[in-house]
Curated annotation (Swiss-Prot):
Residues 178-194 have a biased composition (Acidic residues). Its main location: endoplasmic reticulum. (indol-3-yl)acetate binds at I51, N117, L119, Y150, V327, V328. It is a multi-pass membrane protein. Optimum pH is 6-7.4. The gene is PIN8. Residues 168-194 are annotated as: Disordered. Keywords: Auxin signaling pathway, Cell membrane, Endoplasmic reticulum, Membrane, Transmembrane, Transmembrane helix, Transport. This is Auxin efflux carrier component 8. Changing N117A: Abolished auxin (IAA) transport activity. The chain crosses the membrane at residues 7-27, 39-59, 70-90, 106-126, 137-157, 228-248, 252-272, 289-309, 313-333, 345-365. Changing Q320A: Enhanced auxin (IAA) transport activity. GO terms for biological process: auxin export across the plasma membrane; auxin-activated signaling pathway; pollen development.
Amino acid sequence: MISWLDIYHVVSATVPLYVSMTLGFLSARHLKLFSPEQCAGINKFVAKFSIPLLSFQIISENNPFKMSPKLILSDILQKFLVVVVLAMVLRFWHPTGGRGGKLGWVITGLSISVLPNTLILGMPILSAIYGDEAASILEQIVVLQSLIWYTILLFLFELNAARALPSSGASLEHTGNDQEEANIEDEPKEEEDEEEVAIVRTRSVGTMKILLKAWRKLIINPNTYATLIGIIWATLHFRLGWNLPEMIDKSIHLLSDGGLGMAMFSLGLFMASQSSIIACGTKMAIITMLLKFVLGPALMIASAYCIRLKSTLFKVAILQAALPQGVVPFVFAKEYNLHPEIISTGVIFGMLIALPTTLAYYFLLDL
């Protein structure tokens, strides 16, 4: 059971994040220390340096040979289920005022519902409840986030950005359609069929170009290199006992240790540019909270039952899914300008209700 001392440790882990965010907000809104270009530069530094190095640090310090296959499968199944649910909802519900089309909303929903703040808030809260076993499980979940889900998230961001750019394939397809409509009465049936085949081929070529463009962007992203090198080094370290040279290790820690603080500072800078703290509006804020604290845990319960997780592993998997949204997806959303106002609202208010929400799920699991 959680004691008052444990609650103090949770608050101690949360308050510094709000301090960083508040400093960012005050420095931009009231002190006018940063221009919009400088704010964008700070966010880019976090996205291109701090987060990749933090990912490397987390992955390289985890033993890949002791990870739970059932936990990995359950985590993968949860992400798959949430994509299916979001895709089904978007077939019938078309949000207004958003960017990126349906793919953009799937990316945002995925960021909110199943990428929690496991490292900063999950460790103190769940370790207080379940001890060292919970810490070991959470370390594996953090590694999965950094190694798999952030990489996939970046690919989806790049794919969405590539789709938004005008392509020659799209222009050809549009021209072909206009000509077909103008001359439809004068063309024989065979020529119509040939043009339809040409249009389909043009669409296929356009899709391949978009995928290749997104892939090229992904493979030059620093986070891709950081995660790949991290898992290779973790394998060498835990199999052969190799250690990083001290100067390299300290250089990585120097930059990565401030990553989350800089991310929260960037969040504060973004808030300062908005007219309201609830930048996305009350309705969207409520939907965000439902995605985070209802849909995410519910789908983790379903996947945990399917994979047959048991005992502490089952409970920790569900409780970590009920943790508030992580700040890293906000950094990516701001970098790609895809609904950062929605994700920032999820981060801010999610951290405020983190402890009571987690305790509510804890008591439900003990019934």
